[in-house]
A protein has these predicted regions:
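Glycine-rich beta-strand-centered segment in the early N-terminal region that forms part
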Residues: 18-34, 48-87, 127-129
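Cytochrome P450 core scaffold surrounding the K-helix E-X-X-R motif
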Residues: 39-43
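NAD(P)H dinucleotide-binding glycine-rich loop of Rossmann-like/cofactor-binding domains
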Residues: 83-166
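Mid-domain Rossmann-like dinucleotide-binding core that forms the NAD(H)/NADP(H) cofactor-binding site
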Residues: 130-213
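Glycine-rich cofactor phosphate-binding loops and adjacent beta1-alpha1 units
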Residues: 154-164, 182, 197-265
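Residues in the short beta-alpha loop(s) of Rossmann-like NAD(P)-binding domains
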Residues: 192-193, 248, 272
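C-terminal hydrophobic helical "lid"/dimerization subdomain
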Residues: 230, 274, 278-326
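Rossmann-fold dehydrogenase core element
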Residues: 241, 254-293
Length: 326
């Protein structure tokens, strides 16, 4: 089969690789769409020791089951494979399983390929009216769904339901959409890039600004750099909540004194639970997350150029979806 293989820092190649082989209780999936995630970019830039070359990246994917009793079923893939036996798994927090695996990280190859093998329990069927490109957005949308859910659960019930989202990339946009789906009507996205901001404003569905002087009960940091954490620390109201989902850099930015004296809650949020993933998929199917028309589709064979364009900051769309059969 063909795959886009990470071969070293800023090097990916579209080439032949051994066919994906399902294990026991797994299905072979013909990949129809796979999105480029920020973590794929971290690996591409050589910033992720967990993803050593050579490796097939990609974990945001949808496709069709090949063979077996579910042959032909259209599915979106939950890439987190958990043990199902530990206390975290049994309590519905599979994302905290100590033995979890994820495709695109050894020992599991990723979805920037024509085929991938996945456990049956990680597949959610996709109705015919939902495109594969839209279904592939379930994974990044679930990341934000999880962050928003935790943030709203922590928010004091007397506080206004309004939120600031820092960052207009896919995770930030997804957070704004999840907030709206959870009945938070006053949502502002801060995005400094003129091109990205103009692109998002053109959709007409999002309130995107370059900067704001307001403060907010809930702040979602969808970037995760010291500068954005500093902004979150400044913009959150006393008694409010910061939900941190971005993984830009490891340290710096938080005003711990202010957070302590004003009882600001800080929540680290990692991926999603299986239930978050299912709920996100259903929200997509029901149209509660909008038209999801803020993506750019490219052929997987042109993946090297897509990574370069993202590296050079010349992509206006929040998400590039790679199509293996284009």
């Amino acid at each position: 089969m063909k795959a886009l293989v990470y071969e070293g820092v800023e090097q990916v190649a579209f080439r032949d690789v051994p066919d994906a082989a399902p294990r026991e209780a797994e299905h072979l999936i013909r990949i129809e769409a796979a999105g480029i995630c920020g973590s794929d970019m971290h690996a591409y830039l050589g910033h992720d020791a967990r993803r050593p070359a050579p490796l097939i990246l990609g974990h945001e994917a949808a496709g069709t089951i090949v063979g077996g009793p579910r042959d032909g079923a259209r599915v979106t893939i939950n890439p987190l494979v958990s043990c199902s036996k530990c206390s975290a798994c049994k309590s519905g927090r599979e994302n905290l399983c100590a033995d979890r695996q994820i495709i695109s990280m050894p020992p599991r190859e990723g979805a920037f390929a024509q085929y991938v093998a996945m456990p049956a329990s990680n597949l959610v069927e996709v109705p015919a009216h939902v495109s594969f490109a839209m279904a592939a957005l379930t994974e990044p949308l679930a990341v934000s769904w999880h962050a928003v859910r935790l943030g709203l659960e922590a928010l004091h019930p007397t506080m206004d339901r309004k939120a600031l989202v820092i960052g207009g990339g896919a995770i930030g946009v997804a957070a704004a959409l999840a907030l709206s789906a959870m009945d938070v009507d006053d949502v502002v996205i801060v995005e400094p890039s003129d091109g990205r901001r103009a692109y998002l404003q053109s959709t007409g569905a999002l309130n995107v600004v370059k900067e704001t002087m307001q403060d907010f009960p809930l702040v979602i940091d969808a970037v995760g750099f010291a500068a954005t954490r500093s902004m979150a620390s400044t913009m959150v109201q006393p008694g409010g909540v910061i939900a941190h989902v971005g993984l830009g850099e490891d340290a710096g930015g938080l005003d711990i004194r202010r957070m302590t004296l004003q009882e600001i809650t800080f929540i680290g949020t990692y991926t999603y639970t299986a239930e978050d993933f299912r709920q996100t998929a259903q929200a997509i199917f029901d149209g509660r997350l909008g038209g999801l028309d803020w993506v750019e589709e490219r052929a997987l064979s042109e993946g090297a150029e897509a990574f370069r364009d993202l590296r050079n900051g010349v992509v206006a769309a929040p998400k590039i979806i790679l199509m293996p059969w284009a």
